[in-house]
């Protein structure tokens, strides 16, 4: 079946003008995730912020109670004992100058990036490579840290970084279609709570304005914003 026809069929039964309670929306999305692979369940939160203003930037990290369901490759910039700690904690790639050279050459064999503070002068050179991918280590979200073992375990265990995009939207994967409805609802509420706690001082009016849930290949379902808390 062509993707267009499949999506059209999946949209049947969804009222595009209606806002559904979160649990009902998740059920509808799961029922329509019928691809041969285990689709990712994604959430989009439209926020009442303008991220072009520094005092309206939203970013942070949340530990999803039920994990993400995906295998996350973690790269760590560290030396000596901290490099050993990172390896012992399960980091996939660990290095210093050698890892910087690999990344500069375009060999990025990780999805998340962690660094010890002393490595940042080196890692700072990679801003043009890691920045656009949203992978630049940042102390505000715990990826520049001396606790590399804790950061690696968190990244592997279900921590999700979020950052508002230009249009004022936070998007994140919150699990897989194979997850139970209850686990997906718990993960979505954890994300919404973390985004709420990250509300910037410059935000005025309604903060979480619109919410939608979808699967990788399926249609979006609009959610009552009040039901995500």
Swiss-Prot record:
Identification of the protein by name: Large ribosomal subunit protein uL1
Subunit structure: Part of the 50S ribosomal subunit.
PANTHER family according to UniProt: 54S RIBOSOMAL PROTEIN L1, MITOCHONDRIAL, LARGE RIBOSOMAL SUBUNIT PROTEIN UL1M
Organism: Rhodopseudomonas palustris (strain HaA2)
GO biological process terms held by the UniProt record: regulation of translation; translation
Lipoprotein found in the keyword field: no
Annotated NCBIfam families: rplA_bact (TIGR01169)
Keyword line: Repressor, Ribonucleoprotein, Ribosomal protein, RNA-binding, rRNA-binding, Translation regulation, tRNA-binding
Sequence similarity: Belongs to the universal ribosomal protein uL1 family.
Superkingdom classification of source: Bacteria
GO cellular component assignments: cytosolic large ribosomal subunit
Described function: Binds directly to 23S rRNA. The L1 stalk is quite mobile in the ribosome, and is involved in E site tRNA release.
InterPro entries for this protein: Ribosom_uL1_bac-type, Ribosomal_uL1, Ribosomal_uL1-like, Ribosomal_uL1/biogenesis, Ribosomal_uL1_3-a/b-sand, Ribosomal_uL1_CS
Short name of any one Pfam family annotated for the protein: Ribosomal_L1
């Amino acid at each position: 079946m062509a993707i267009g026809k499949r999506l059209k069929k999946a949209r049947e039964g969804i009222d595009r003008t209606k806002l559904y309670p979160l649990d009902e929306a998740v059920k509808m999305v799961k029922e329509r995730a019928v691809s041969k692979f285990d689709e990712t369940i994604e959430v989009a939160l439209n926020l009442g912020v303008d991220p072009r203003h520094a005092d309206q930037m939203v970013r942070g990290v949340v530990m999803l109670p039920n994990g993400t369901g995906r295998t996350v490759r973690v790269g760590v910039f560290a030396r000596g004992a901290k490099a050993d700690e990172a390896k012992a904690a399960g980091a996939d790639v660990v290095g210093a100058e050698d890892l910087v050279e690999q990344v500069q050459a375009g060999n990025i064999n990780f999805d998340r990036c962690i660094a010890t503070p002393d490595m940042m002068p080196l890692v700072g050179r990679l801003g043009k490579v890691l920045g656009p991918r949203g992978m630049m280590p940042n102390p505000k979200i715990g990826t520049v840290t001396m606790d590399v073992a804790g950061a690696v375990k968190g990244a592997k265990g279900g921590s999700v970084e979020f950052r508002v995009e230009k249009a004022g939207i936070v998007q994140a994967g919150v699990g897989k279609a194979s997850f139970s409805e209850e686990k997906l609802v718990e993960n979505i509420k954890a994300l919404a709570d973390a985004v709420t706690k990250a509300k910037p001082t410059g935000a005025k009016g309604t903060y979480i304005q619109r919410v939608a849930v979808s699967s990788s290949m399926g249609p979006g379902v609009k959610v009552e914003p009040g039901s995500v808390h």
